[in-house]
Amino acid sequence: MAQQRGVNSLQFNQDQSCFCCAMETGVRIYNVEPLMEKGHLDHEQVGSIALCSMLHRSNLLAVVGGGVNPKFSEISVLIWDDAREVRDPKDKLVLEFTFTKPVLAVRMRHDKIIIILKNRIYVYSFPDNPVKLFEFDTRDNPKGLCDLCPSLEKQLLVFPGHKCGSLQLVDLSNTKPGTSSAPFTINAHQSEIACLALNQPGSVVASASRKGTLIRLFDTTTRDKLVELRRGTDPATLYCINFSHDSSFLCASSDKGTVHIFALKDTKLNRRSALARVGKVGPVIGQYVDSQWSLANFTVPAECACICAFGKNTSKNVNSVIAICVDGTFHKYVFTPDGNCNREAFDVYLDICDDDDF
């Protein structure tokens, strides 16, 4: 279904107020609440696009070619400035970063751009007169896993470490350009990292392994494990992990077609295994019992990749989660601390017309 609609990838901006859609027909930019298309780059301008990344709600967009009819190479990141007034639309391409291998992901903040390849990560100053500040060798990272703290106070970068199942954290503000920083590693899982995310302040990192049954949260300063959340018992591929803006909740989506919502601020809201009330159990069962299960969940099309994030709070006791799927569907659910979860909105974002420039 994703191929029918031609969606190659989806990504939220830094505060999850917008998302960009890389397509066989170009790029579309959407506002989340209310849902509306804010702009697009058509196929004549950019060809088919594999990846796109937004810088907050600005006019700057990073694109990487790919798909069936690309105009641009998969080894280049192009920066598109939609606010630039030019006669030829091609002149809106203001920057280009080119490498020797395919670009797998791009992350941006107000002063830096991060470009992720399979075995290397590059950090440049951005957007004025970009200069390469750092490069980091990584273990095989075929999904281009990486997250960057958007906070003005903290310049934290996280990506899979050299050791299987580990996370590497780099404070870009404490690292001198051209030098390699001392490794700051968290041994998070026994198998390969499959998904990771930082909260908005960069104080907590969440990760899941390829097994996909557990999500573990760590303090980025002390490296201590804070909590272990159980998505389920069957292996799954996690597509996305996101924190609420105040880090009170966490949501996660997987190929099981379920979006799980966990409480972080008040973990007593999360469900526990019935065995937790039994008392002492063996070490293997004990790990299962000690885990916290989601306080609420909802379903989206199974095996359809989707990204999820928290919406605007409608009241003190009502929160919302947005799920955006590559099949073109938009889902909004509201949930309460007692675990009630109900659909509030459903739409097909690919059928929404252009509203404005972005």
From Swiss-Prot:
Keywords: Autophagy, Lipid-binding, Repeat, WD repeat. The L/FRRG motif is required for recruitment to PtdIns3P. Pfam families: PROPPIN. Component of the autophagy machinery that controls the major intracellular degradation process by which cytoplasmic materials are packaged into autophagosomes and delivered to lysosomes for degradation. Binds phosphatidylinositol 3-phosphate (PtdIns3P). The gene is wdr45. GO terms for molecular function: phosphatidylinositol phosphate binding; phosphatidylinositol-3,5-bisphosphate binding; phosphatidylinositol-3-phosphate binding; protein-macromolecule adaptor activity. WD repeats lie at residues 2-40, 188-228, 233-272. The keyword Ribosomal protein does not apply. The keyword Heme does not apply. A motif (L/FRRG motif) lies at residues 229-232. One of its GO terms (biological process) is pexophagy. This is WD repeat domain phosphoinositide-interacting protein 4. It is found in: Preautophagosomal structure.
